Amino acid sequence: DVANTNIFDPGDTSTHKECQKMYEEQISWAKEAGVDFVIAETINWTEEMKIALKAIKDAGLIAVCNFAIPRGDKTREGHSAEDACKIMEDLGADVVGLNCYRGPEMTMKLLKKVREKVSCHVAGLPVPYRTTEKEPGFLNITDHGCNCIPGGNAFPVALDNLLCNRFEMAEFAKDCVK
């Protein structure tokens, strides 16, 4: 597993090279340990995902590319989730999809568009919280049943009431195989 580096800057090519070195180092350790595949996840820049994907494929490993889309339905540079996934498929990703930030319902909304756009395998790994159209990501979610949370933001210490139960997660899993 490799994730966003938090140093990628689309306007600074030196950060692209630094990201490449970071990914190559992590992936070399994974390959030495005998992994079969690498998941690049929680990345919301398409260009950063390209760097991670190249490092995975250059190592001769199966590549899973899961974008994190915190708001709206676009990557940081403005690609729709489905277009970003299609770009990764076209560049050789074996599996594309979405993870993090969004709960099951909001993740599924985007996954359906991804499924229509790509022919490779699709992955969906939502966070287990009840995110909504108004608050699609759990980092900025509010608990409307409680007005005593400092600042009003449930993340990171007051998410308990927003947690999906096992039946909600089972429904997401069932929807994935439809």
What are these regions (language model features)?
Residues D1-K178:
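Domain-level signal for soluble alpha/beta catalytic cores
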